[in-house]
UniProtKB/Swiss-Prot annotation:
It is found in: Cytoplasm. GO terms for biological process: L-proline biosynthetic process. Pathway: Amino-acid biosynthesis; L-proline biosynthesis; L-glutamate 5-semialdehyde from L-glutamate: step 2/2. This is Gamma-glutamyl phosphate reductase. It comes from Lactococcus lactis subsp. cremoris (strain SK11). GO terms for cellular component: cytoplasm.
Length: 413
């Protein structure tokens, strides 16, 4: 199956690269309309995935990641329209000059080629990944999780129907419907067809892709995000920020998983936070010995807890004596995604932003803002936590490469 699908997307990538900006934008706008028109059809297929998930006893938080409603489908359509309105990076000239030999050298943006996307649960990723790849002249091979197979299949069917109506080869998007681990590993090693592989999901998925893939990988989004409450922090502000980052949507990668508190305010802040957060939702605190003394309820934290992406109403807590200790702790356990400091000390804020090794570093704000739309990128294909090629929310430019065009008049060397 991988051989057949890989050849299709590889062949189609040549046509995708030739599409004009107007052709791409017109198609994305029509696809947005088509999604809304097919709302009932999509929800009907999504219901099969939801029933299967509930039958397997999956938690409601994880079921929510699968669920497609009329509003969420409308939001997906809005995302398509926003991508259509974004500037097309393909063909953008980054630099141009004439060298000492008289050669005219231009560097411009071009598509990556063929993108492989391996992801879990959220069927909206099917639309996000396709729209960004299509806008940047790439073809894409999608492999979603077995838990969202019916949703992913109907979404790809709708995309393909619209491609055929627009007289664009439908090979610019293919779905690996065999969700077995064996087929997934074949996809990870399909380097003769795929130019890049982007995994999006749990730490387990991403680590497996890194271990097995021969296709170049852009690592995304394990989100062990931490908030440090400094001694000068406004404790009301800190409480609001932590509650939002932990409880607003705990199953996403930019939710807070860990809290670090300065010892001078721990006895005042931790009871206040625990009281207020439990009014929103009961949260389990896994805390070090010093933090436990300030909490009315909690369990002892292990080293593993400080590095864990819980994706649930669980928060690890560490008390530290100073900013340097906080930075060292965060850099030790962080997944390099998003970290935040709550402080009124300008120099501590600057030091934190300078020394924390993460894709996004906040001062006095929730980590929940790390998102392609918020950062002005439109839809995102993922949030990269590595340093090569792309880092942070990955929009259109992250799905491009560059090439040099050199014009001469007979020069030799």
């Amino acid at each position: 199956m991988i051989e057949e699908l890989g050849l299709k997307v590889k062949t189609a990538s040549k046509e995708a690269a030739k599409l004009s900006t107007a052709e791409k934008n017109t198609f994305l706008q029509k696809l947005a309309d088509s999604l809304v028109e097919n709302t009932d059809r999509i929800i009907s297929e999504n219901a099969k995935d939801l029933a299967k998930a509930k039958g397997h006893g999956i938690s409601e938080i994880m079921v929510d990641r699968l669920r497609l409603t009329a509003q969420r489908i409308s939001d997906m359509a809005t995302g398509l329209r926003q991508v259509a309105e974004l500037p097309d990076p393909i063909g953008q000239v980054l630099q141009g000059f004439t060298n000492l030999d008289g050669l005219k050298i231009v560097q411009k943006r071009v598509p990556l080629g063929t993108v492989g996307m391996i992801f879990e649960s959220r069927p909206n990723v099917t639309i996000d990944a396709f729209s960004l790849c299509f806008k940047t002249g790439n073809s894409v091979l999608l492999r979603g999780g077995s838990d969202a197979i019916y949703s992913n299949m109907v979404l790809v069917e709708i995309i393909k129907e619209n491609l055929l109506s627009a007289k664009i080869t439908d090979g610019v998007v293919e779905l690996l419907s065999d969700t077995s681990h064996a087929e997934a590993e074949k996809m990870m090693q399909a380097d003769k067809f795929l130019d890049v592989l982007i995994p999006r999901g749990s730490a387990r998925l991403i680590n497996r892709v890194k271990e097995k893939a021969t296709v170049p990988v852009i690592e995304t989004g394990v989100g062990n995000c931490t908030i440090f409450v400094d001694e000068s922090a406004d404790l009301d502000m800190a409480t609001r920020i932590v509650i939002n980052a932990k409880t607003q949507r705990p199953s996403v990668c930019n939710a807070a998983e860990s809290l670090v508190v300065h010892a001078k305010i721990a006895d005042e802040f931790l009871p206040k936070l625990q009281n207020e957060i439990n009014k929103v939702h009961e949260v389990e605190f896994r805390a070090d010995e010093r933090s436990l003394k300030a909490l009315s309820a909690g369990i002892p934290a292990t080293d593993e807890d400080f590095g864990m992406e819980f994706l649930y109403y669980i928060l690890s807590v560490k008390t530290v004596d100073n900013l340097d200790e906080a930075i060292e702790h965060i850099n030790t356990y962080s997944s390099r995604h998003s970290e935040s400091i709550v402080t009124h000390d300008y120099f501590n804020a600057q030091k934190f932003q300078d020394e924390i090794d993460a894709a996004a570093v906040y001062v006095n704000a929730s980590t929940r803002f790390t998102d392609g739309f918020v950062f002005g990128l439109g839809a995102e294909i993922g949030i990269s936590t590595q340093k090569l090629h792309a880092r942070g929310p990955m929009g259109l430019e992250a799905l491009t490469s560059t090439k040099y065009l050199i014009d001469g008049c007979g020069q030799i060397r």
